[in-house]
């Protein structure tokens, strides 16, 4: 049964169904979760393991190598990159595609539990990467001068309150100081009693316990027995009696200074110059980021109102960014709807027609919100971007049906006939064009890597829109036309006036018919002109630079301050403060800043800029200016860059990985290549992971000498570590808070090498021996950081391009590597964000090829012809070339977004060709010649073609102009290329699709004639 006829005859049912969809759409829109980005799970994880006091080589040997061996035995691991530095091993794991990272993490924990890591080494921490959750939901700064009090306030009051919020996964605290009980051993007194730090540590552990002893009966009642010997005050610790090897005891306070004090600072934080503590609030997976962030703000306001001592600031809250982005995207969608409806009114000059379109578009969008809720999608930049990009497309089907209904009515048919037959006549071409458009999104949504995850929501929403538009066009539009169509006013003269639109429109139509007639009768010239256009367009964009994602001005500049080895955390913080002062002097757009110095070797500074509309410079320009302003700052290495989501989605810049075993050789190669890469014009922030080797003290135990005193290499190493670094012996509870008890030497051994050699090492017999008598204490050169790749040592050179053109920079680096002779056993290859970009480009290129193939398949199935799809798709090369031509004209780069827009064009620009070719075929079936059919069909179809093109283009204008959100640069590139491709393809379709039709028609007839001539020639032979 005809769908349009069914809907008109069942008006009430149809309208109630539409109303129900609209109501559900409104309800579900308010229940959809909002996020900045889709859930992007990178197939990677990080492993961190701390071993305080160990140097890079010790970390590599004792921690990194065992962890690497365990990791490589886990199924699904593709590559392992590790970094061994002072006190920490950092390992990046890359999994093969489609690996379940949660299951892999469980297997990693099982492997790690079976390892025997050194005493004092922390447990490995596994962190899976989720790009959408890498940024915290909120950053809270507690301000004040008493850092110990702030630390207690943060840990006892603020952090617990924030962790109780529904949706909060964790709250990390940095920048404060911890209180601890420090037992500082007097070396001379301890040696006199034959005491060592390790022995005192054992006694403290034995004296501080809560031990279950069993059960006893009190009559018929069974009671549990617990031995309680817990320490709870500093005096109790100081008064512990230490048994001596020679008999008797000595009070701990007599051989050591026992004090309740703050620990050494391992992190410093400040906001706008005011010292404080930084709390990073992370949401749990699946939680509503906006509600979570807003709840954090509300909780802080409530805490401050209850406790006047809480002074805080919130430099970052995700809800502000997301709300602004979502609101702007929705405004862009509404504006697109209005502009599309305006086009309909300008062409048809009918209030009923305009109202039909104005009603059908919101119904489609509300239906999409229902499907988004069902499919558990979020309102994010990509899903809203899909709606914004599809607003113009959803009206295309309705316009074609509407225009055809009006044409039937203008020919004198009644309302029922006009609505039913007018819809039926174009249903085939509508279905074909809709399926081709949807088909292109299938391979895009199934693309692997980051590209597939980024565009999954985008593809689903736009596919929902387009399929919904087809349903609305063949059901709701004919029904609304049946209600709103006024037969008395829709007569031929009125329609002709609307169609001609005055003298200027008639002149344009006459010009079009004249050109069309010319090219139809001069096919070779038409083909040559179209080929020349493709060549010109492609030649103009040959020098377009390539980037992974368009630069997104998010209003933040990040600065990394790298300090020399051995620097204290206070020095790193002071340098960060100095850079912040320079920023305050040179950047008028600076709104606020905060920094954290988490180790003595680096500090991270974040500059928050004023809103984009309030400044003339981009975040990248400001970062470049700050880089120049800090160029002369001595004593550290400063890296400045605009905060870029693209870097989080795959890195940025270009890297060179050099692999080999000998560190000295690696350093030599890296130094040579770093100098050459830094000399590339436009190269900035060029550095390598190799650094100057620094002196390190190495203690090598003499096993024979140790055995004479009853010592082992391990007991000597433990004694040296305890004397220099200190050992956490136990924990005590003071004021309901666990406090570490740290045993350490008095610091004399740290003063010089001779003092270290003189350190007294206690023996099992109660005596002591100088360290220098049982071990060799010498100075050796050691690297600051040791990097490994797949269990081989590696050095990485990284850099970026000042203008972002990493493709040109990579080309220059390739030339350098090609001319560089490497020693045997060493390799150097490109890596970094550039290789990630090329992999994603390759995936999208394959998706484009598959999309074109699917378009052909759909068209061939729809028209039951192998030839007609070729005619229709001849427009694609010119559309692609025209879209790329727009990039250099508008100052944009070739990015992953640009390639996605080409894939979209593959399914959209053919729609006009489908309408033309289908109608030409219909007229030829009615008996017209080829030329007559073309010259009659094309002018009649020019209005729906122009209407659909203009509605799509105007609906994309807000996106192209950057009116769809705070990070509008991403969708702006897509809007620009789509508009350019649509403009070029429409003009070419109207002029040259008939040419291609004639050429292929001639070739088909020529082949048929040759086939017919062969049997005739065979029969004529004697």
Which residues are covered by each model-predicted region?
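Signature of alpha-helical transmembrane segments and their immediate interfacial
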Residues: 1-34, 424-426, 497-550, 607, ...
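Extracytoplasmic/periplasmic membrane-proximal domains and adjacent transmembrane bundles
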Residues: 6, 37, 45-48, 90, ...
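Hydrophobic transmembrane alpha-helices and their membrane-interface caps
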Residues: 25-30, 35, 46, 338-407, ...
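Flexible hinge/switch segments at interdomain interfaces of large molecular machines
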Residues: 34-45, 81-87, 121-144, 172-178, ...
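Solvent-exposed, membrane-proximal periplasmic/extracellular interface segments of envelope transport
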Residues: 59-131, 188-209, 230, 571-649, ...
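Transmembrane alpha-helices and their membrane-interface boundaries in multi-pass membrane transporters
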Residues: 391-405, 426-446, 453-498, 605, ...
């Amino acid at each position: 049964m005809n769908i349009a006829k069914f809907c008109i005859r069942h008006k009430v049912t149809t309208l109630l169904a539409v109303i129900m969809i609209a109501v559900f759409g409104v309800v579900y829109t308010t229940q959809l979760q909002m996020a900045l980005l889709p859930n992007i799970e990178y197939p990677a994880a990080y492993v961190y393991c701390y071993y305080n006091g160990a140097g890079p080589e010790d970390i590599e040997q004792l921690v990194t190598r065992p962890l690497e061996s365990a990791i490589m035995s886990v199924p699904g691991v593709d590559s392992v990159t590790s970094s061994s530095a002072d006190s920490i091993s950092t390992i990046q794991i890359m999994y093969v595609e489609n690996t379940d990272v949660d299951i892999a993490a469980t297997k990693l924990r099982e492997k790690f539990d079976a390892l025997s890591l050194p005493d004092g080494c922390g447990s490995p921490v596994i962190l899976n990467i989720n790009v959408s959750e890498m940024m915290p939901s909120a950053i809270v700064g507690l301000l004040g001068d008493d850092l110990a009090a702030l630390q207690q306030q943060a840990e006892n009051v603020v952090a617990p309150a924030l962790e109780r919020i529904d949706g909060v996964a964790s709250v990390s605290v940095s920048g404060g100081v911890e209180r601890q009980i420090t037992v500082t051993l007097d070396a001379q007194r301890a040696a006199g009693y034959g005491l060592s730090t390790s022995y005192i540590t054992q006694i403290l552990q034995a004296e501080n316990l809560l031990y279950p002893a069993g059960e006893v009966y009190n009559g018929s009642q069974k009671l549990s027995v617990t031995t309680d010997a817990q320490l709870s005050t500093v005096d109790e610790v100081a008064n512990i009696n230490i048994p001596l090897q020679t008999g008797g005891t000595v009070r701990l306070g007599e051989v050591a200074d026992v004090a309740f004090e703050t620990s050494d600072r391992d992190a410093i934080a400040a906001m706008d110059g005011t010292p404080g503590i930084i709390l990073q609030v992370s949401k749990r997976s699946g939680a509503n980021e906006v509600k979570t962030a807003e709840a954090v703000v509300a909780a802080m306001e409530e805490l401050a109102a209850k406790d006047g001592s809480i002074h805080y600031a919130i430099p970052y809250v995700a809800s502000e960014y997301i709300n602004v982005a979502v609101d702007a995207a929705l405004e862009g969608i509404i504006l697109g709807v209005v502009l599309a409806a305006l086009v309909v009114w300008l062409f048809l000059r009918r209030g009923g027609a305009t109202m039909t379109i104005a009603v059908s578009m919101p119904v489609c969008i509300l239906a999409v919100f229902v499907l988004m809720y069902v499919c558990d999608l979020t309102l994010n930049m990509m899903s809203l971007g899909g709606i914004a990009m599809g607003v113009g497309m959803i009206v295309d089907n309705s316009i074609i049906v509407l225009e055809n209904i009006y044409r039937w009515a203008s020919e004198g048919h009644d309302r029922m006939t006009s609505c039913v037959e007018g819809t039926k006549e174009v249903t085939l071409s509508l279905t074909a064009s809709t399926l081709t458009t949807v088909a292109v999104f299938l391979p895009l949504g199934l693309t692997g890597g980051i590209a597939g995850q980024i565009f999954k929501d985008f593809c689903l929403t736009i596919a929902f829109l387009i399929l919904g538009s087809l349903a609305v066009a063949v059901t709701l539009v004919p029904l609304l036309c049946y209600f709103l169509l006024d037969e008395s006013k829709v007569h031929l003269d009125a329609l002709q006036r609307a169609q001609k639109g005055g003298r200027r429109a008639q002149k344009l139509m006459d010009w079009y018919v004249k050109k069309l007639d010319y090219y139809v009768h001069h096919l070779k010239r038409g083909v040559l002109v179209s080929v020349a256009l493709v060549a010109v367009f492609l030649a103009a964009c040959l020098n377009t630079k390539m980037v992974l994602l368009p630069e997104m001005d998010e209003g933040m500049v990040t600065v990394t301050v790298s300090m020399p080895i051995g620097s204290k955390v206070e020095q790193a913080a002071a340098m960060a403060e100095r850079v912040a002062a320079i920023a305050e002097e040179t950047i008028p757009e600076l709104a606020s800043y905060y920094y954290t110095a988490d180790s003595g070797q680096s500090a991270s500074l974040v500059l928050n800029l004023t809103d984009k509309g309030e400044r003339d410079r981009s975040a990248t320009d400001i970062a470049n200016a700050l880089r120049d302003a800090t160029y002369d700052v001595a004593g550290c290495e400063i890296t400045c860059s605009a905060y870029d989501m693209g870097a989080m989605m795959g890195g940025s810049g270009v890297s060179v990985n050099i692999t080999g075993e000998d560190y000295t050789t690696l350093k030599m190669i890296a130094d040579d290549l770093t100098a050459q890469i830094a000399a590339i014009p436009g190269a900035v922030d060029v550095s390598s992971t190799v650094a100057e080797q620094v002196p390190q003290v190495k203690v090598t135990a003499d096993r024979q000498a140790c055995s004479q005193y009853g010592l082992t290499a391990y007991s000597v190493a433990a004694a040296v570590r305890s004397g220099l670094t200190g050992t956490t012996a136990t924990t005590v509870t003071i004021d309901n808070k666990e406090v570490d008890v740290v045993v350490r030497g008095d610091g004399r051994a740290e003063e010089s090498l001779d003092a270290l050699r003189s350190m007294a090492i206690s023996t099992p017999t109660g005596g002591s021996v100088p360290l220098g008598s049982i071990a060799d204490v010498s100075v050796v050169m050691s690297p600051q950081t040791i990097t490994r790749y797949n269990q081989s040592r590696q050095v990485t050179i990284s850099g970026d391009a000042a203008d972002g053109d990493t493709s040109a920079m990579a080309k220059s680096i390739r030339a350098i590597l090609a001319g560089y002779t490497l020693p045997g056993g060493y390799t150097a290859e490109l890596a970094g964000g550039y290789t990630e970009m090329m992999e994603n480009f390759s995936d999208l290129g394959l998706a484009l090829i598959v999309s074109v193939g699917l378009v052909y398949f759909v068209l061939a199935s729809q028209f039951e012809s192998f030839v007609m799809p070729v005619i229709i798709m001849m427009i694609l090369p010119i559309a692609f070339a025209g879209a790329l031509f727009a990039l250099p004209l508008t100052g944009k780069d070739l990015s992953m977004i640009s390639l996605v827009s080409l894939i979209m064009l593959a399914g959209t620009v053919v729609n006009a060709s489908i309408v033309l070719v289908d109608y030409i075929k219909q007229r030829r079936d009615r008996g017209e010649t080829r030329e007559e059919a073309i010259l009659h069909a094309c002018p009649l179809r020019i209005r729906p073609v122009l209407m659909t093109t203009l509605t799509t283009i105007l609906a994309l204008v807000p996106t192209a102009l950057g009116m769809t959100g705070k990070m509008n640069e991403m969708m702006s590139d897509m809007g620009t290329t789509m508009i350019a491709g649509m403009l070029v393809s429409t003009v070419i379709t109207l002029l040259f699709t008939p040419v291609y039709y004639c050429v292929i028609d001639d070739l088909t007839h020529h082949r048929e004639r040759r086939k017919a001539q062969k049997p005739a020639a065979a029969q004529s032979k004697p």
